Amino acid sequence: EIVLARRPKVSLTTIILAAGKSTRMLSLKSKLLFKISGEYIIEHVYRAAASINSKNIVCVLGNSPQQLKDFIQKNKIQSVDQKNSCGTADAVKTAISSIPVNKNNKVLILCGDVPFISPVTLRKMISKLNNSDLCLGTCIQENPVGYGRIIRNNKNIVEIIEEKDASSKIKKINEINTGIICINEGVLRKFIGKIKNNNKQKEYYLTDIVKLLSDNDYKISSYTIKNDLETMGINSKKDLVDLERKLLIKKASNLLDKGVLIRDVMRTDIKGDLKVQKDVEIDINCIFEDKVSIGSNTTIGHNCYLNRCKIGKNVHIKPNTIIFGATIGDNCIVGPYARIRPGTVLKNDAQVGNFVEVKNSIIGSRTKINHLSYIGDAELGKDINVGAGCITCNYDGEKKHKTIIEANSFI
């Protein structure tokens, strides 16, 4: 009888480095709590870690502003405190000491200020550990100022030298370390405590583990990340704005390539998840946040703001309109200067005109509210004509009350 040995169970731990002081943001709050593309920077990183089935996700805090610590606690994210701010190796050592030992595990290390690393890239890096002990995420940059340089010997990575410790010759190397590292847990635990602080900053650099592994004949692999949006970090408000602008232009350009008529990709901000059908036209200065879907043959006028809403087909959203948390049926006309608030449903062929606000209401088919009105907590049937200046008085100072107007009425 042949007895096959069981393969050791392998799982993934992700460590997010978030212990920085955020001094270059010139702000009282952590840079990780600035929003980019509609969400906090730390949320983007955490989602990437969660999407690749990390068994443990540990966020390393330290001198982080209190708002970040409160956010981590509120969202029940596992965290550890780095008591002394003395480098990334010490941060990783603190994190790895907080989880149960499993030398067969893989450990992924992410930077908390690099928001757009993709799950696809992370999976490819992790798969490289099947044939190596450590995988580095690298990229080629025309202007690599500020980044650690990748040192190779006959194509093999032997060391990473940080910018502050680099000679003028090494600074000419344009292959840089992205800060994203995947390593076998057993190897990490063996070498993390051997890292020294023999550098100008007197810090314990995690990147020094590369030379330790190379000197001890461990196998080091790399994965070149070609999309620069995935590797761009945020240290200042300028970094934040520059990265978001690049992302927004890319999103708008992708939709343009798919047949959406976007009048100006430089002035269209898609900050969330925008799904668009055929023959949609979007004018300038429009902002889309959270999940927005737009049906075919629909036109969005200039200066519109759409957030968490569903727009039907053959709809005309006129300029300067705000739609938030609402559903707009087919063949509707909305605006200009209309405000459609959460809980509102416009049935097919309804019309809401200029300076009209609708909140938490159902507006029936072919019903028209064309001028200067407030409709709140109401249910309007079909084929109603609401004249200018109408208000549904929904609040008595203590409670909200519903207004019902039945079909074919004229107000």
Cite the ranges covered by each PLM segment:
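Conserved N-terminal catalytic core of the sugar/cofactor nucleotidyltransferase
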Residues: 2-8, 13, 39-124
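Glycine-rich N-terminal loop/short-helix segment of MobA-like nucleotidyltransferase
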Residues: 12-36, 52
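Short beta-strand/turn micro-motifs composed of small residues
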Residues: 18, 61, 111, 138-139
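Residues that scaffold the ATP/ADP-binding catalytic core of kinase and kinase-like folds
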Residues: 24, 160, 191, 243, ...
